[in-house]
Amino acid sequence: MSFQESFSPKAATLLAGIAMGESPRWHDNRLWLSDWGAREILAVDAGGRSEIMLRTPFELPFCIDWLPDGRLLIVAGRENRLVRWEPDGSLVTHADLRGVSDGAWNEIVIDGRGNAYVNGGPGIIALVTADRAVRQVADGIAFPNGMAITPDNRTLIVAESHGKKLTAFDIAADGGLSNRRIWADLVTGVPDGICIDAENAVWYADVPNKQCVRVREGADVLQTVDVDRGCFACMLGGHEKKTLFIVAAEWRGMEKIAEVARARTGQLLTVETVVPGAGWP
């Protein structure tokens, strides 16, 4: 791994007091996120004003992303369902994931064609097509976490947290995944949530190393942002999509997750970047 243009700008706190933030998404000029610890979905504007958009009945994990028609999908991870938030405020089942796996589901990314990729279970990725058909498209992933899709809809990149790498797949016309390959071997990096920018570089959040890192294919490190707590996910947004939003919190292990949620150490941080966000999410 080589290091080029590496520096560590200081992150600013936009919002504090989050129980346990995850799944940040830029939508309708606000940063949306799932607060797993409070079972809420929040939207935060550029001034740090937050609004509870939805109180969910779901236990963690519940990650979010938007269909092209503007409807929100929520991964009800422990219920093995993909849920859709309707304009009237109701929650309806968009897809039943039990036919693929009854293990807990985790992250989601939706491409420009309306295909939803959901991962979790025993290291798998499922595809829910625009017509809501469900099938498995990848397996053998070492703790799948964040996913991103390139602007041309041709490549999906997934974070393998336990594998300490980013893995890429080609996306077929029918949404299937093939040509699996290591996109970046991070060596000591532990990727969680990820996003992609207009230069096809990936930002990944890293909980144990308390940082967000920008890498290009091949694992060259371009930028790092170090903070004082674990970074769970990141998203490029803002007016020009050049603001990196980071959801961070203290991490004391899964056995103390309720304790961490009660302490509300979660923060939404921001860092200004040069290259805008692109692709999905």
Feature-to-residue mapping (PLM):
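A short helix->beta-strand "capping" segment at the edge of beta-propeller domains
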Residues: 1-17, 46-48, 180, 271-274
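Blade/loop signatures of beta-propeller domains
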Residues: 1-9, 29, 37-38, 44, ...
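A short beta-strand motif characteristic of beta-propeller blades
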Residues: 10-15, 49-55, 91-98, 133-139, ...
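Beta-rich, blade/repeat-based domains predominating
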Residues: 14-30, 56-76, 98-124, 137-155, ...
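Short loop/turn segments immediately following the C-termini of beta-strands
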Residues: 36, 77-78, 121-122, 161, ...
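Loop/turn-rich, solvent-exposed surfaces of beta-rich toroidal or solenoidal domains
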Residues: 164-165, 169, 176-180, 184-220
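Short loop/turn segments immediately following beta-strands, especially the blade-tip
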Residues: 169-176, 273-278
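Blade-level signature of beta-propeller repeat domains, shared across WD40, Kelch, NHL, RCC1
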Residues: 235-281
